[in-house]
Amino acid sequence: MIYKIIDIPKINNTKGNIGVIENDTIPFDVKRVYYLFDVPSGAKRGGHAHKNLKQVLIAISGSFDVVLKDGKSKEIITLNRPDKGLLIENNIWRELENFSSGSVCLVLASEEFSEEDYIRSYKEYLHFVK
C-alpha cells in the first residue's frame, strides 16, 4: 500500500461537528497549509511528485479522487469525508481528479514551497524512483 488513511478526531455536536487537527494527529510538523477550491468540472490537479515533502489531503467539502503511483503500482482513493485524511509520503506521484461541484481539498504539507522539490514529468519521476 502506497498511502495511509488518517482518522481526524471529530467532536460530534447537535449544532454541527468539529474536526480537530493537533500536533499528534499528523505524523509530521505542518509547515504549510493550502486548499484547492472552485476546481472546474473535468479539471485535474497535481500531476507531480515531491522528493522530500509529505502531505495530508482532506476533503473538507464534496469529493474527489486521488490517483497515486509509485512506479510499480497504482491506487485510486476517493476522499469524501472531512474526518479522514490521506497521507502521501515523498516520492509518490499524485493526480487529483473527478472533483464534485463545491468540493474543497485541504492540504497539510511537511515543508514550505520549494520548486526544487517537485518532479513534474512522469518520465523523469520513473527514472528518479528506479
Residue ranges and their predicted role:
Residues 1-84, 101-102, 107-108, 113-130:
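Non-catalytic, conserved peripheral segments adjacent to functional cores
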